[in-house]
């Protein structure tokens, strides 16, 4: 069966959407970063026809629902200089690749259990020339600092990985002292927060405004006790 092709969209149209979106988020991009993000959208569309990385096939919607959605967390995190970041269940590289592009001083690691998705992520590292990006394949709960990953992380993020309580249970051993777990959610996850495991708590909840997207979005910061 022939894969459905994404509709063609002029790059200038996408660039203007990106310019408008980042202005609304108060994010200043260099020309190089803007081109990297646009190249990423094009490559995501190209590989998606083969690997089905995302259900979204329209480039405009990819820009809004993937790129701008991922960028919406940057204003809340960018004061953390030289951070070590783990993106769990990264899939097509979201939000990790976007973070690596706009925060070149961060060291970003992408994690997924599906080898073909890791292969795509590795290809993006090469094609987008992201020296601050690394990829590790495997279950997050089995990753050990000093073995599969060099060390613990200042920020562990996820955009579409599991229930919040499960996310915390599986990833908490990788949080560095003073670090946090950051979960990107749609509607406010009251039920998931109520099920958080012992030794963890919500530090703050932020409502996100994604440009051009009429949908509810939240960012939840969870801290864990070091003894747990």
UniProtKB/Swiss-Prot annotation:
The keyword Magnesium does not apply. InterPro entries: rRNA_ssu_MeTfrase_G, SAM-dependent_MTases_sf. It holds the Pfam family GidB. GO terms for molecular function: rRNA (guanine-N7-)-methyltransferase activity. It catalyses: guanosine(527) in 16S rRNA + S-adenosyl-L-methionine = N(7)-methylguanosine(527) in 16S rRNA + S-adenosyl-L-homocysteine. Keywords: Cytoplasm, Methyltransferase, rRNA processing, S-adenosyl-L-methionine, Transferase. It is found in: Cytoplasm. Gene3D superfamilies: Vaccinia Virus protein VP39. The keyword Hydrolase does not apply. Its EC number is 2.1.1.170. One of its GO terms (cellular component) is cytosol. NCBIfam families: rsmG_gidB (TIGR00138). Specifically methylates the N7 position of guanine in position 527 of 16S rRNA. This is Ribosomal RNA small subunit methyltransferase G. It comes from Burkholderia ambifaria (strain MC40-6).
